[in-house]
């Protein structure tokens, strides 16, 4: 261990010698502290007693005060950093630019091109003996210099293009890496921790913590440094990240005071003195070791990667992003993380599959091209021209074969979409950067894209939907219900004394109210917001809680039962001077009231509190408060007389019972003003919002109505946690998916829920197979116990302000403002990523199809590709790197929220896109072939076809090349719209990158054509020829308008491409129109069809039911992820026939909106999200049958017709 110590001390960049010399002013050395922190439990206690006496002794040696902390003097901080190190673990060195260049060179297609170019170069300098070139066929026998010059220029130009492609790729990777390092440091800066300095409690960045700091530790913290406990309340730590021990470890001064960095506080609170930071902390030591061993592992991994890369060939290039949560994360990650991994991101899966398919097709085409060229040449030379094979002709023939090989490789280069991973990376990187401005700090790249597919959001209430600024607005004190805060004199003196002491000591001492930052502003609430509301209540009663706290400091508290999600209450025991004990308790009113056997009456004396009285208070006080959306808290106490033996404090159930109720208060937490609008947007976008909260059901329902999660007259479900558990579990208490499936489609509010309930709900929705598309669930969480739900969800959002470190660790995105509207922005960005990729694909596949067909046909007919290797590489650069940059950086618009989610199995290339790809490819091929075979006549120039081996560039082929590039440039503008919109220029000037790239490419094209000469096989063109090229290019814009006029539904032969998962055969009728796809050209057509659709709806329903039964036989055998179909007709609950289960009414019987059917009939036409799942129980089957037959549920084709209008 000693070696290890030296190792990491050296690592921290401060020389050992300096440290040891300097320790003189502190009574303890770095090495001593490190060896102390390696001990646990009793060993550590013995060592502390032996060397330092007690923890106070360590504080003395570290020159710090347990109550006042460090002075915060800059000189002192600097000295401590010099001796004990900074709280910073050096990150792994980033890859250098040269390493990234080397990685880019590993691309298989580029390696083939490099070899071909080198062979071409070598042969161009080879002069065959004798002058019999004329016997060898059609070689251009001009001046020897010119011939050799032309020969080497092509090889050199290919090499140069390869260098360009490699440099651009490496630069992109480098800037991406730089950006994510910036993101990482931003995440680190966001992390703050509470310490005491100069007697003041302040929050400082984790990196600024130094040895000797007194840090406050509370529930949910991720400890940033090693330390020793000075004072603790019921502290339990999860040390599994360091020790692998799954049980929570109790920490106390007399058992085990050692707190280690990287561990999570699962319960309780306390204070510790920091004894080791950075590379000297337990986490730091492990990181240092990993850093040393990491390089060797990296080399091993690279070897493996090379093997797989060689095997996968071009297809390997298509892995868009090795994401944090990708299935193919390396083994090391698996070992290090004991949390469940999420499955591969949807887009990644689809892209990988599509790219492999394109790669295979490209490989096939290039192979056929080379074979045809070689055969044609051999047959023409040997049989047609009857030339003998002469030894001196061999090099020249080899040059021909190399030329054919280069053509084949360039066909492959153009066909293989290397730009695909680049487009994904750029789009995600661009989005992540911009999302930061929208208060979304993305931790895992995939999450950004997955959010675009989200179909359900399970949101917390407090702080996300509400403002998290809590105030007491009503109170029930001395048997009187005050609708506003009572005057202090209205409350009997002894009740006031109980209130003041009970609230002051039974709220965490970290919760406090500070004066406003600006004059006239609101006071600042620090710590738990509910506790701040209670402290604020005391201030409203003209009492100061701080006086009580000064009198009873935290160390004097005898025992604290801290708040957790199981208890839903907090209790504190005080020891009085006469030896008696008093316990104060506060918590959810219905929970604490059940433990109350007495209540303080109007004269302030305790009187008997019977169950009947409790029911009266619930009906007359608590329910009215809750129905106004108030959170109700009950305050109570109990005395333990002095004469009796001291209670067994660990036996909580016997202690916190037989209480006397002091008061019940109603706390208001107003709904954020922007939330109702954001929820409407979600519902319009086909996303169901559910509220999961710990509050009681009436409070939750009232808030849900205010937010718009529930609307009056709807028959959606509101359940409490225990009711939810009763319905989803069988007699043995096991959760059954079938039971969850009967509840979740209608569930909108889950109240009084524990984190386990939240996890169960999320898992149930994700695992459900009742819809064709698997649900994509986003979850918000702030508590330590929300970790499992955040991990299980497709996208986990943690609260940046109220969230615990544990929740942030488990999340994918951190909401820096804790606001629900930021989630809606994340949806918008996610859908934008999807659209950006689709735009790029639409553009690229058009170029691919045209370039491959032109090269292939040209090669077969004229033994030469009309587009030369270097030109192809330039086109490749345009369409891969530059187009991916241009199209992947389009900003999102509100229109993205008018569509339903794409769904996991929706193909990347929709039928509208397929129509655009084939339509534009047709136009471009007609233009190119017309120019290729009739260009010389049209422009009255020499033909470039059948030119000899080293002929100078021809005007003819230059016009073909130039027109081809112009068509791509204008088609890039067309590619901006993928849903059949007419106006392709809409918002074009909002995207400066797009305009810059299009103009830049145009300028470079002019330079290449006019001055490129032999290297680019270009000849200068006249103004007239240029105008023709541009005119034919602009033709793609007009042609695009013509294509968008043709309704997609008429083109039955079109299929989609790029399915992420295995795809079933779908009957042709069902393919008539995509559910989520809005082709704007069809809107006019649709209006007339709606009545017709309505008339046919019942028949369609019956057909769907039959289809459902037919397909479910097969679908039941498949995994949920692999089932895929474009429609999710058959699984809508309207079409499900319930079995003879015992019927449980699915409306909570306390629901105020029980007369839903009558109200519903009188309401205006349903909103997109209304009655999302109309029939969920046999009880409603008869009453709702007619409605379900004529209503359209979101996701059904009819519904998409109605809403699109």
Curated annotation (Swiss-Prot):
Pfam families: ATP_Ca_trans_C, Cation_ATPase, Cation_ATPase_C, Cation_ATPase_N, E1-E2_ATPase, Hydrolase
Localization (cell): Cell membrane
Positions on the Extracellular side per record topology: 126-153, 372-403, 862-868, 934-956, 1013-1024
Sorted UniProt keywords: ATP-binding, Calcium, Calcium transport, Calmodulin-binding, Cell membrane, Ion transport, Magnesium, Membrane, Metal-binding, Nucleotide-binding, Phosphoprotein, Translocase, Transmembrane, Transmembrane helix, Transport
Topology of this chain in the membrane: Multi-pass membrane protein
Induction: By vitamin D and 1,25-dihydroxyvitamin D3, and by calcium and phosphorous deficiency.
Residues that coordinate or bind Mg(2+): 460, 462, 782
Biased composition (Basic and acidic residues): 300-310, 322-343
Name of the featured protein: Plasma membrane calcium-transporting ATPase 1
Protein's UniProt keywords contain DNA-binding: no
Family: Belongs to the cation transport ATPase (P-type) (TC 3.A.3) family. Type IIB subfamily.
Region annotation (Disordered) ranges: 296-343, 1145-1205
GO MF, one annotated term: metal ion binding
GO process terms (BP): regulation of cytosolic calcium ion concentration
Keyword Iron: no
Catalytically driven reaction(s): Ca(2+)(in) + ATP + H2O = Ca(2+)(out) + ADP + phosphate + H(+)
Broad enzyme group: translocase
Species of the source: Gallus gallus (Chicken)
Disulfide bonds: none
Cellular component GO terms, alphabetical: intracellular membrane-bounded organelle; plasma membrane
């Amino acid at each position: 261990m000693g070696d290890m110590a030296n190792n990491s001390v050296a690592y921290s960049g401060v020389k050992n010698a300096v440290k040891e010399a300097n320790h003189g002013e502190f009574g303890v050395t770095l090495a001593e502290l490190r060896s102390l922190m390696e001990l646990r439990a009793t060993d550590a206690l013995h060592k502390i007693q032996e060397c330092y006496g007690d923890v106070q002794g360590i504080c003395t040696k570290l020159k710090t005060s347990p109550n006042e902390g460090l002075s915060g003097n800059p000189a002192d901080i600097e000295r401590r950093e010099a001796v004990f190190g900074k709280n910073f673990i050096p990150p792994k060195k980033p890859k250098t630019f040269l390493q990234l260049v080397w990685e880019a060179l590993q691309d298989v297609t580029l390696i083939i091109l490099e070899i071909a170019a080198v062979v071409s170069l070598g042969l161009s300098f080879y002069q065959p003996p004798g002058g019999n070139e004329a016997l060898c066929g059609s070689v251009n026998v001009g001046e020897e210099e010119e011939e050799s010059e032309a020969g080497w220029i092509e090889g050199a130009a290919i090499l140069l293009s390869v260098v360009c492609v490699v440099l651009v790729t490496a630069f992109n990777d480098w800037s991406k890496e730089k950006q994510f390092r910036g993101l990482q440091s931003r995440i680190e800066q966001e992390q703050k921790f509470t310490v005491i300095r100069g007697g003041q409690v302040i929050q400082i960045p984790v990196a600024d913590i130094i040895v000797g700091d007194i840090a406050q530790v509370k529930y949910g913290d991720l400890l940033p440094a090693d330390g020793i406990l000075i004072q603790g309340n019921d502290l339990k730590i999860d040390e599994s990240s360091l020790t692998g021990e799954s049980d929570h470890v109790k920490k106390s001064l007399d058992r085990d005071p050692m707190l280690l960095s990287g561990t999570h506080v699962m319960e309780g609170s306390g204070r510790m003195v920091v004894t080791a930071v950075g590379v000297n902390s337990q986490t730091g030591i492990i990181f240092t070791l990993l850093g040393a061993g990491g390089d060797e592992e990296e080399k091993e991994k690279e070897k493996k990667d090379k093997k797989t890369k060689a095997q996968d060939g071009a297809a390997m290039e298509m892995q868009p992003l090795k994401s944090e949560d990708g299935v193919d994360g390396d083994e090391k990650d698996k070992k290090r993380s004991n949390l469940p991994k999420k499955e591969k991101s949807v887009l990644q899966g689809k892209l990988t599959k599509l790219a492999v398919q394109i790669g295979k097709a490209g490989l096939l085409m290039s192979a056929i091209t080379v074979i045809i060229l070689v055969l044609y040449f051999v047959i023409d030379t040997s049989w047609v021209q009857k030339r003998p094979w002469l030894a001196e002709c061999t090099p020249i023939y080899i040059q021909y074969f190399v030329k054919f090989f280069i053509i084949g490789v360039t066909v492959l280069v153009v066909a293989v979409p290397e730009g695909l991973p680049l487009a994904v990376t750029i789009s995600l990187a661009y989005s992540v950067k911009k999302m930061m401005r929208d208060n979304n700090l993305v931790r895992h790249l995939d999450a950004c894209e997955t959010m675009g597919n989200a179909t359900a959001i399970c949101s917390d209430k407090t702080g996300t939907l509400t403002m998290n600024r809590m105030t007491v607005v009503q109170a029930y004190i001395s048997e009187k219900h005050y609708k506003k805060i009572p005057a202090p004199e209205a409350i009997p003196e002894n009740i006031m004394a109980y209130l003041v002491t009970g609230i002051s000591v039974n709220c965490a001492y970290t919760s406090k109210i500070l004066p406003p930052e600006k004059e006239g502003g609101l006071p600042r609430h620090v710590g738990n917001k509910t506790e701040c509301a209670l402290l604020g209540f005391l201030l409203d009663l003209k009492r100061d809680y701080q006086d009580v706290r000064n009198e009873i400091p935290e160390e004097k508290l005898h025992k604290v039962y801290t708040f957790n999600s199981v208890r839903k209450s907090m209790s504190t025991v005080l020891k009085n001077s006469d030896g008696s004990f008093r316990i104060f308790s506060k918590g959810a009113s219905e929970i604490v009231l059940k433990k109350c056997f007495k209540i303080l009456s109007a004269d302030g004396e305790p009187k008997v509190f019977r169950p009947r009285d409790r029911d009266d208070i619930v009906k007359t006080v608590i329910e009215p408060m809750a129905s106004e959306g108030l959170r109700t808290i009950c305050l109570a106490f109990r005395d333990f007389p002095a004469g009796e033996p001291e209670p067994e404090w660990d036996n909580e159930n016997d202690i916190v019972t037989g209480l006397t109720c002091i008061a019940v208060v109603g706390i208001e937490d107003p709904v954020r003003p922007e939330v109702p609008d954001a929820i409407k947007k979600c519902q319009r976008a086909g996303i169901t919002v559910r509220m999961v909260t710990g509050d009681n059901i009436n409070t939750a329902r009232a808030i849900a109505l205010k937010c718009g999660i529930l609307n009056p007259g709807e028959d959606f479900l509101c359940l409490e946690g225990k009711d939810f558990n009763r319905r989803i579990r069988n007699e043995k208490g096991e959760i059954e998916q079938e039971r969850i499936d009967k509840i979740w489609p209608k569930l909108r509010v889950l109240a009084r829920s524990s984190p386990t309930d939240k996890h169960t709900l999320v898992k149930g929705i994700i695992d459900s197979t009742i819809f064709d598309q698997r649900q994509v669930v986003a979850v918000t969480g702030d508590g330590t116990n929300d970790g499992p739900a955040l991990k299980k969800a497709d996208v986990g959002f943690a609260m940046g302000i109220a969230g615990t470190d544990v929740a942030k660790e488990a999340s994918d995105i951190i909401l820096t403002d804790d606001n629900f509207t930021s989630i809606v922005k994340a949806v918008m960005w996610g859908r934008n990523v999807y659209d950006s990729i689709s735009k790029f694909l639409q553009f690229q596949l058009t170029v691919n199809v045209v370039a491959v067909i032109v090269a292939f046909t040209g090669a077969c007919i004229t033994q030469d590709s009309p587009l030369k290797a270097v030109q192809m590489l330039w086109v490749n650069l345009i369409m891969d790197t530059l187009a991916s940059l241009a199209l992947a950086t389009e900003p999102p618009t509100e229109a993205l929220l008018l569509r339903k989610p794409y769904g996991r199995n929706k193909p990347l290339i929709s039928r509208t896109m397929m129509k655009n790809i084939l339509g534009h490819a047709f136009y471009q091929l007609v233009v190119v072939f017309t120019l290729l075979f009739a260009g010389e006549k049209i422009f009255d120039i020499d033909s470039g076809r059948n030119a000899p081996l080293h002929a100078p560039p021809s005007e003819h082929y230059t016009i073909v090349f130039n027109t081809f590039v112009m068509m791509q440039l204008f088609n890039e503008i067309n590619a901006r719209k993928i849903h059949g919109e007419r106006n392709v220029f809409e918002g074009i000037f909002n995207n400066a990158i797009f305009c810059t790239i299009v103009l830049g490419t145009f300028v470079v094209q002019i330079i290449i054509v006019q001055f490129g000469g032999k290297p680019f096989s270009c000849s200068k063109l006249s103004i007239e020829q240029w105008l023709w090229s541009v005119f034919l290019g602009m033709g793609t814009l007009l042609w695009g308008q013509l294509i968008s006029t043709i309704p997609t539904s008429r083109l039955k032969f079109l299929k989609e491409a790029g399915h992420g998962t295995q795809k079933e055969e779908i009957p042709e009728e069902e393919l008539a129109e995509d559910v989520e796809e809005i082709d704007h050209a069809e809107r006019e057509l649709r209006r007339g069809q709606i009545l017709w659709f309505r008339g046919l709806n019942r028949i369609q329903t019956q057909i769907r039911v039959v289809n459902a039964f037919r397909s479910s036989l097969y679908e039941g055998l498949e995994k949920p992820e692999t089932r895929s179909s474009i429609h999710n007709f058959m699984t809508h609950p309207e079409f499900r026939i319930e079995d003879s289960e015992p019927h449980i009414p699915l409306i909570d019987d306390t629901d105020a909106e029980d007369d839903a059917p009558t109200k519903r009939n009188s309401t205006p036409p349903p909103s997109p999200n209304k009655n999302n799942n109309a029939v969920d129980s046999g009880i409603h089957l008869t009453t709702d049958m007619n409605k379900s037959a004529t209503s359209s549920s979101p996701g059904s084709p009819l519904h998409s017709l109605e809403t699109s209008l």
